Amino acid sequence: LHLLSRRQRQMCIRDSPIGVFLVLYLGLGILFEYVMEIPMGFDNVPIVVAFLAAILTACLQNPKLHFDQKLEVMAQGVGDKNIITMLLIFLAAGSFVGIVGRSSAESVAYCMLSLIPARFSVAVLFVVACFVSVAMGTSVGTITLLVPIAAAVSKASGFDLPFCIGSVMGGAMFGDNLSFISDTTIAACNGQGCKMKDKFRENFGIAMPAAVATLIVILILSFQTTIKGHVSQPYNLIQVIPYVLVLIGGVVGINVFLVLLIGIGSGALIMLIGGYVEPVEMLVRMGNGVSGMFETCMVAILVAAMCALIREYGGFEALLGIIRKAFKGRRGGQFGMGLLVGAMDIATANNTVAIVMANPIAKEMAAEYGITPKKAASILDTFSCIFQGVIPYGAQMLVAISAVNELGSQISAFQVMPRLYYPMFLLISSLIAIVGVKGRRRRYRK
């Protein structure tokens, strides 16, 4: 801070609510996970409480504004069209995933494993994880479903267990980055004000080369392994139809609400007519799916309120000033945006929260450096995916390790990390995409 002017130092102090949140969340997470050795310690940190403390800090600042005025500023921030849209999409996506359940994803995996030779089992796991996560919109959900299958493949075929787990995690992050119903996509697109299909096309050119490179590496390593056997389980592909409809609808550019309604309607009909669930159980599943999004919605609301106050105080100007000094031109602006969301993700271990927190700063950076909304949304989603995919204390890694341990095997995050090929290739692909940007810095105009 000593390198900044007095005015910039004052503005940095106005950014302190973000610092309060990071200290509380990261500090408690490290305490729970590594000192007290509580399993999945970061998930035990009350993130909503940490954000409430940050908002309280923001409310105590700037005595020139009365408390009622601060409430009005926060209400205007929460009532923003993009925030409301994001919340509604979160809830609709939760309802869709709740209806279809885990059986559809398992059917895709077992179908492909039964059709393709055992030597290609790990490659199949990666491709299935890509498809399932794009369809479901959740990397953690995909990992939860496919890690037991990956463990079974490892045991039956002789493939290295970290190799199988790392391939599933890589595929899960591919879909989390591209899916139309992923909370990261929803947060990035609504925060930057771009259409999901535009962000998808922007991301696709970065993610697909990384996925192809990952698949090639997996195939090369697969041919160096001695195969012992294969996995065979029953499956039902009819239950996959809702996922396919949602995927097609998103790619062709149908409104995301309409796409989700189609998915919810088709999923409900298939599950009821096929006799897979009773009507009451269907409603319970929908409720559980929506409930699973409540914390994400609360975080979005609290971050919107906190950032509205910080913006009102002029706090973001200091961060932008630091970024302007460190990064020059459009390429520099994109690097800065990627590092910003990456730092937020390292601190919070949650890529959705990282994007929501970075959104307001990134939007001002986009205007400053002449970065289009779809490019800004793509950078936020991609770099948060890269960092989230490799940190050893992220939900994805912790869920994978926990699932393997429950199955009676022992594995550590540091055994899996060298096998996370997709995030590594995604970083390379992202850097190439940024370095390839042409043109001088210019302010973006809608």
What are these regions (language model features)?
Residues 170-173, 177-233, 238, 389-390, ...:
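Juxtamembrane and boundary regions of transmembrane helices in multi-pass small-molecule transporters
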Residues 1-9, 13:
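Single conserved hydrophobic/aromatic residue that forms the stacking wall/gate
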Residues 33-48, 76-81, 112-117, 201, ...:
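Interfacial loop-to-helix junctions that mark the boundaries of transmembrane helices
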Residues 86-97, 117-149, 324-363, 368-369, ...:
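Hydrophobic alpha-helical transmembrane segments of multi-pass integral membrane proteins
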Residues 45, 80-86, 110-127, 154-164, ...:
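Membrane-interfacial loop-to-helix junctions in multi-pass transporters
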